[in-house]
Amino acid sequence: MSTIGSFEGFQAVSLKQEGDDQPSETDHLSMEEEDPMPRQISRQSSVTESTLYPNPYHQPYISRKYFATRPGAIETAMEDLKGHVAETSGETIQGFWLLTKIDHWNNEKERILLVTDKTLLICKYDFIMLSCVQLQRIPLSAVYRICLGKFTFPGMSLDKRQGEGLRIYWGSPEEQSLLSRWNPWSTEVPYATFTEHPMKYTSEKFLEICKLSGFMSKLVPAIQNAHKNSTGSGRGKKLMVLTEPILIETYTGLMSFIGNRNKLGYSLARGSIGF
């Protein structure tokens, strides 16, 4: 009687995919009776293969869900905003960027940013209807501090985000009213927080306009020049660029949890709904 755990009498076979009727060369073990040496079993590669999951934004069917990446969409937005700046102020545009704004309630919002020689423009652009919905103008001479760093949250916060961003201050947060601080739709917040757009790696074009480093390289000199040329209260100011954690004061975070996971802040194809 053979002992328990003995594998005598068993023959190793390789797994084959369904429909493969031809035996492979490794299906049978070499069994030469005259060979005095122990039988050698060659190692076979596993039937399942482990591969690194690719960046989802490299896949066209995912990137096309974002209307900003569709052919001609970002170019149309830039031309619209160029025309608006030419008609209203005539200022010189330093560059365009497509970034994600994170509001004081941790909600993500897709935004186009323009830096001119005097102004930072934050545009809410509808990439579906190809029209500017909202435009916020911030004088560069009013910006006095920029913070770069990782996002941090209160210890009890339920909806935390990873990654890094930047925050631009043109007013004191201490002077912000309690009402505007707790109002998720308030437009009186004296700062703006940004991070890179999720479509950054879609193409070389989007890699260029979605990078925070590229945005900073144009924004900082423009602010410094605006301070030098300012004739008002901003004259003589010095811009502070700090590396420190960026605090987002959200505690429950249910609203941002639902909105961010469903990408409600982006012009996105939501799919068809039928019966």
From Swiss-Prot:
Organism in which the protein naturally occurs: Homo sapiens (Human)
Keyword Cytoplasm: yes
The keyword Cytoplasm belongs to this UniProt entry's keyword annotation: yes
Domain hSac2 per the UniProt entry, residue ranges: 68-240
Protein name stated in the entry: Tumor protein p63-regulated gene 1 protein
InterPro entries: hSac2, Inositol_phosphatase, TPRG1-like
Keywords, alphabetical: Cytoplasm
Family note: Belongs to the TPRG1 family.
